[in-house]
Each structure stands twice: as C-alpha cells, then as structure tokens.
Regions:
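Short gly/pro/ser/thr-enriched loop/turn and capping motifs at secondary-structure boundaries
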Residues: 73-75, 168-169, 190-195
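N-terminal nucleotide/polyanion-binding subdomain common to many enzyme families
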Residues: 1-86
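Proline-aspartate-enriched helix->loop->beta-strand connector
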Residues: 152, 156-161, 165-166
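Short glycine-rich anion-binding loops that position phosphate/pyrophosphate groups of nucleotides
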Residues: 43-47, 164-169, 190
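A short helix->loop->beta-strand "cap" motif at the edges of active sites that frequently abuts
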Residues: 36, 106, 180-182
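A transmembrane-helix-recognition feature enriched in membrane-embedded lipid enzymes
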Residues: 72-77, 200, 205-244
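Conserved beta-alpha
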Residues: 74-151, 155
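Short, flexible loop segments at boundaries between secondary-structure elements
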Residues: 140-143, 182-218
C-alpha cells in the first residue's frame, strides 16, 4: 500500500500518483502476498458520477487504488498544479497483468460484457495466454449473482477482472470483495477490445491524447457520454480560480 502523500485529490476523488510500471509491480506484489485489493481506473465520467452520488463517491474513495485512466484526469491535475506522472489505463494494466499471470500460471476470473463477447474472450485467453488458469468467465447479463459469488469463492482467483461498466462494477466489487483475497479490478469495456469486438485507438492517436476522438468516430452514439469532459473541465477551472 502507498502512503497518503502519494494521493492527489481531483474534485473529491483521491488519485494515486504513480507510473504504469510502479503500479503493475505493486499489484504483482500484492497478488503474490494474497492481499485483497480493490482497483478503480477512473476517468472524468467516473469523477462526475461520484460528485452526483455520495454513496458511489465513498465506494471509489474506499478502494485501495484509484488511478488516472483518462487524459482529462492528467490535464485536470496539471491545471490544479497537482501533476500526476502519466495515465494508468485499465486496459494496459489488464494486459500487463495477463502477461504476468501467464508466466506465473495464475488463476483469473473474468466477469462482464455481452454473452458473445465473453464466449470469444474465453477462446482468446486460451489461445494468447495458454498458461493462465481460467477460474471462470461469466457475461454481465445476469439477474442473480449468487452463482458468480459461489464460483469466485470456491475458485479463489488471484485476479478478478470485472467489466460491468461504471458504476455497476464498483458497486459489485465493493459488495463482494470480502469473499476472496484477490486483486479486484473494474475494467469497463476492456473485454470488448481484447475479444476483438471493439478497436482501440492506434498508437498515434494515443500519443497525441486523441483516443477519445477516435472512439467517438468509431461509436458516434458516445457523443452524449463525451459531454462529460467539458463539464469536468469547467469544474476544474472553477476550482482553480476559486482557490485564488
């Protein structure tokens, strides 16, 4: 665990000031020690959702690690003169952990996405990471989570990736993390990308901080969700000038 001096508060959410490598190394250490960890990779949408819902905000801030997944968080931190080292995306962190889990023969449970995505994901994991022990794969379209809870409890995975989208995935983890001393991590739409149902922005777009625009071009229906960014930036500047 990191001390509080490593935390940077952005609009009420405490972000860990850390690099990608440092974070992945910490998660590996935690996993090897069988520590129970709740990971949130937060973007501006999550920050805004937390401002509207006190219970959700409390859940986010009760997580062991909240990292900056989203260039808006990095820019906001810089504007507030509380710079964070770099983005720590859920997708990249998941890939790093999958590679490590494959080397170390770790057990992983996958929860979330549509049924067809979950099915394709199972084949993809077996093909790309053959030494990973799949503790279970379940899509996110369930009415009763008792079967999922029992499966996790009985298999005791090293890592549990939850792709239910926010805020559902954070509520799920918060409610059930006590059943297994694992790394519990919300990963949003990462299963869709890993299974090949969605495309991630090419490196050029990522390096120029335009991943959000690429996703908008791929999925125009995201325009309503994208409106969160200007609202978020308005709050950032408001906080900056009120401090003066």
């Amino acid at each position: 665990m990191f001390n509080k001096s490593k935390l940077v508060n952005i609009l009420g959410i405490n972000f860990l000031s850390i690099t990608n490598k440092q974070f992945v190394d910490q998660l590996k250490t935690d996993s090897n020690l069988h520590l129970n960890r709740f990971v949130v990779t937060a973007n501006p949408e999550i920050v805004l959702a937390a401002r509207k819902d006190k219970e959700y905000a409390n859940i986010i801030n009760s997580a062991d690690y909240v990292v900056a997944d989203g260039i808006g968080i990095i820019k906001g931190a810089k504007i507030l003169k509380k710079p964070l080292p770099e983005r720590v995306t859920g997708y990249d962190t998941m890939l790093s952990l999958l590679s490590w889990a494959n080397q170390e023969h770790k057990k992983i449970y996958f929860l979330g996405a549509k049924p067809e995505v979950a099915q394709t994901l199972s084949s993809k994991i077996k093909e790309t990471y053959p030494r990973i022990h799949i503790a279970g794969i379940n899509d996110g379209y369930f009415k009763d989570d008792s079967y999922i809870v029992e499966t996790i409890k009985n298999s005791n995975p090293d890592i549990i990736f939850v792709a239910l989208g926010f805020p559902k995935q954070e509520f799920f983890i918060n409610e059930h993390r006590h059943i297994s001393d694992s790394i519990w991590m919300g990963v949003g739409g990462s299963f869709d990308v890993l299974a090949g149902y969605s495309k991630r922005a090419p490196i050029f777009w990522q390096k120029h901080h335009l991943e959000w625009f690429y996703r908008l071009l791929q999925e125009p229906q995201r325009i309503i969700r994208m409106m969160a960014l200007p609202k978020y930036m308005l709050l950032i500047y408001r906080k900056k000038f009120l401090k003066k």
